[in-house]
């Protein structure tokens, strides 16, 4: 109890330093939304949407919520998701010079393969500039006035700013801070932020798909103790292997240690558990449509049962 009270006081300090009060809220007109993560299992969901009829699903009140680099994929322009969210600082913290030349990013100096990552980030923003349908874009208030957000001057995109200040303390305190939009649960993964913001936006049912989260079985440690992670996404034919590196305090290149990696994964799933708790508190449904996967915080539903709720296209 004393620990929770201390965390409540500590969180108040964080809120005063990092959060903005009275951010404009957004209320979604739809009842149900599907958050489409980038895991391989999302392919089955997207293909089924195409066969049932994307516009048919939308007419029946279903909305789509995309994340991160989804706009780089052809499916983006067929699904035309109404909602989009980014959270990771790498999507926001770069200059005009880096946008024009990805190789100039400071991280690329110690992680040469980051140039490819930055190039894809740039392509993500360029694709968003081509959006010709109404879109609600959720952006952390910390980055609302950064270069790249200001660059995105597409009149079809409405920005909704949210506070990403991790809330700790007693359950009652956390609930009140969430209600007042002063912070959120730990969102080590962008999907958790989507779920949370969707609930705050009034959605009654939040479905998630493509949340494979099999990071822990896709790593190996090579002969010099470098962790190699294999990444797989629904839009890639080949899995990508890359070393997990970091920049040390002295500017040199270091290796991410195994305990650091698993500590991050613990935060991912702890965050999901907290979001699940809050969803129950405010009587919202969060349902996992991912076939397989390693997220155990939410109830599950098969794709067959999910699509069975909707009438088929004529």
Ranges and model annotations:
Residues 1-314:
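Metal-ion/cofactor- or nucleotide/acyl-coenzyme-handling active-site neighborhoods
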